[in-house]
Structure formats: C-alpha cells, structure tokens
C-alpha cells in the first residue's frame, strides 16, 4: 500500500493567490504525456470492476474520504455550493473538511489546536483567500488550513489522511 501524503486539488490561479511565491516548470510537451480530463461518466471497465454498488450517493458524486485508524467516512461535495465546512468526529478524532466550490477543492484537518477543539464554518462574507472561520476566536482560515487573520494568525491545522475522489472510486 502506498503512503498517502497531504495534498489539495485546485487550479493554478487559486494556488498562486494563496502562494504567490510559487514557481512551476512545464515538463510536458503534450505529446509524451497527454492531459486527460477526469471522467464524467463511468466506463464499462469501471462498472465491471466495482462489485456491489453503494447507492447512498450517485456514482459520479464527488466526495472527500477521511480515514483515521480503522474508521473511515466520506463527505459529499456539492459542486453548486461555493464554500462549505463539515465538522465531525471520525475514529474519535474531531475533524473538519473544507470545501471550496469554484476550484472544486477539498481538504481535511484535525480540529484540535493546543488542546482546544475548534468549530469551523464556511463564512459567506469572508474573502476567497480565507473563506473559513472558527467560532471560538473568529479567526479566518485558508483552504490550506492556515490562519491568516485573528487571534490564531500564523497557526496551521494538521492535515488528515484523506482523498478527494468520486463516490464509486
């Protein structure tokens, strides 16, 4: 089994907004490595390999799966919603899943910071650079789990082992 590392799927413009110091190198000429879009329908091959189908969500629904110890949970990602935050416990750990619709990006974090459990929410009036807030301090947080405004400015949340994928995956 491969070891997963924290990651976020986003677009380049959003990444640069959050990390203006970034540099990218284009190593692909489009010939040797073709760019492929994510599938919008299930192939016959995928359907054959699925086994029994879990019908709680549509097969192509986006989810963010979280795994802590022996516990796992999938959080549905609604592409019609600009920003959302799931606050839950998985495997006895307080977690939050941040969703940012314009870039179809989700990430999961531990909500515990210095023995304090934070309660996050998607703030409709916060800027896109920091669309989430915690109720306890009113601090603003980025999609990458960094506090950029408020009493916790400069602090970072700890990433959780997870994956953004389609429900059937």
Language-model-detected regions and their locations in the chain:
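Mid-to-C-terminal functional-domain signal that highlights helix-capping/loop sites
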Residues: 1-169
